[in-house]
Swiss-Prot record:
This is High frequency lysogenization protein HflD homolog. It comes from Vibrio parahaemolyticus serotype O3:K6 (strain RIMD 2210633). It is found in: Cytoplasm; Cell inner membrane. Belongs to the HflD family. GO terms for cellular component: cytoplasm; plasma membrane. Gene3D superfamilies: HflD-like.
Length: 205
């Protein structure tokens, strides 16, 4: 896959979309369904033709691109988004250093792909299956990502499954970010360029 500013922006928007949806689910118990479907599809799309192919079309990443442009700021909400992104990227670094875990993750995702022959992607059972991949393979590598929200919402099993499935999608995009040459310096020194690229993509939707 190409290592261009466009590719890095798309991959980073994928991370942003997953964490923006985590925030929505944790607070309200529901989220943007189209964006959620895109993020779930991204987990299973392991052999894309190009970077955008992981997600579908640019418009499918609208929420993530908007979050990239406006959602990462010093407000409490923005600080929470930033914390989730940093935590996911740290977890991805630990995960990719473990070939055993990466191999197990690949096997479990292939199994989940086969399960879509019997279940719709957004069915509770399928979301539960994706959540269990995160819980069994990714989470034990640590550090644990602390999700904050409305306690009564987060106590509901279906919402816990959605959050974990979304964190798995965030990991998928963090792996993609690294595959297209994304580095920490791009976040520190190159974020303005990614924001400008995201604004261009949003303007043509």
């Amino acid at each position: 896959m190409a290592n261009t500013l466009y590719d890095r922006t798309i991959a980073f928007a994928g991370i942003c979309q997953a964490v923006a949806l985590v925030q929505q689910v944790a607070r309200n118990g529901h989220c943007d369904q189209d964006a959620f479907e895109t993020s779930m599809n991204a987990i299973l799309n392991t052999n894309p033709a190009n970077t955008i192919g992981v997600f579908g079309r640019e418009a499918d990443l609208k929420l993530g691109l908007e979050c990239l442009v406006k959602g990462i700021d010093s407000t409490p909400s923005g600080s929470e988004i930033t914390r989730y992104i940093i935590s996911l990227m740290a977890l991805e670094r630990k995960l990719t250093a473990r070939t055993d875990a990466m191999s197990q993750l690949g096997d479990r995702i292939q199994m989940a792909k086969r399960q879509t022959e019997h279940f719709e992607l957004l069915e509770d059972q399928m979301i539960s299956n994706l959540a269990s991949i995160y819980l069994d393979v990714v989470s034990p590598i640590g550090p644990r990502i602390q999700v904050t929200g409305t306690p009564s919402v987060l106590q509901q099993t279906a919402n816990q499954h959605k959050v974990r499935a979304l964190l798995l999608s965030g990991i998928r995009s963090a792996v993609l970010w690294r595959q297209v040459g994304g580095k920490r310096r791009h976040l520190i020194f190159g974020r303005k360029k990614m924001v400008e690229q995201a604004q261009i993509l949003l303007a043509r939707m």
